[in-house]
Amino acid sequence: MNKLTFIALLIPLLASCGSVSLSQSDRDYVQTHPAPKAFDSKRTEYTCATWTPPSPPDAESHLWYRAATLIHAEGWRKNTRQAQDMITLYEAAASKGHYQAINNLYLLYTNGQGASGTLYAPQPSRARKWLHYGLDKNWAMANYWLFDALYESNAGYRYNPKLALAYLQKAVDLGVPLAQYELARIYDKRFKDYNTRELLLDCAARQGFSAAMDELSRIKRIRYGNLKESLQLMHNALRYGGEGGGEAALKLTMVYAKNKALMDKFIAIPADPVREAAYAELEKALKGTGTKSGNPFYTFPRLDEVLPLSPAKTHWKGIYSAMSKEDAAFYQNPPDTAALAADILKRGIVKKEEVYWSPRPPEPPEDDGL
């Protein structure tokens, strides 16, 4: 499960910000706050609550965040200097209360990261600091982070699956789409309750969560034979980008190919070389190739204008034509991430020694007994 890709693409809206106390890493939230209502595995009714995430506190912090995502999208292809610049940019944005930056830092610090063959070990105390910051701000998403911490023994928390599921269900009731998606998977795999699974997937899909749309598309196609709705869900998933959007683009490429391959249920749809090529371009943009990284942070809000579903006429002019004008300008003329990170350190917005992430020491050679 790649939580990082899913969470990083939630669209931020309204927010407040504030200073961060380093003492937040020293507390244990579950010992100082009452536990939420116990998880009910027999519950089958959910109201599809929605959540409006915090918006960027200012333009500068949002620029730092967006610059960090340019490096983040490189994955293992970024070098060690870029990896540190990314953390500097995220930490600077987070210091102003930028929700998306804090979200990505929590996940980086819990999972670790890699760059050019170099591994960076998890940083539990840093993850804990940002987890507690979100909880203190009453961010609904922070309940999902606490679920993750308790369920995966992250951020210095002890494994407590019962309490973890209680926080997951609380996050669902507060409208967090990733939590809705995660709980849908639990109803599917653990309880074999497919109806509740679909209800929760629909809740997340309504909020633009691409992984939920892609999964719901598969269900509509296979379980119900509803090809029209399945096709629309794939198209919608692509609009919102992310891992689900990349998977949807791959499937749509097959839908409009002469040889439908895995999407042979759509045999009645005529081959369309223009759409096939456009969806292939979008898939590479999101997922990358064997030699180039994709960018799961891309979104395509103008997709219906330039690449509507058939039989409508297309106006495709490449991936930037499907982006917002602001995004197209940003990605075609990206900022100098190294210069931004250096300026942050020069201005003392964050201190180098406080954000430096040392690489994991190399593994000792194996003793072959000779």
Language-model segment annotations:
Residues N79-T88, G117-W130, G156-Y167, R190-L200, ...:
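Structural signature of tandem alpha-helical TPR/SEL1-like repeats
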Residues C17-D85, L370:
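N-terminal leader/linker segments that initiate helical-solenoid repeat arrays
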Residues C203, L231-E243, T253-A261, F266-G290:
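TPR/TPR-like (Sel1-like) alpha-helical repeat modules
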Residues P57-W64, I71-G75, S95-Q100, L105, ...:
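Short helix-capping/linker turns of helical repeat alpha-solenoids
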Residues A92-A93, H132-G134, K170-A171, D202-A204, ...:
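Canonical positions in the second alpha-helix
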Residues G18, E305-L370:
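Long C-terminal extensions of eukaryotic subunits of large macromolecular complexes
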Residues N2-A8:
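Sec-dependent signal peptide recognition
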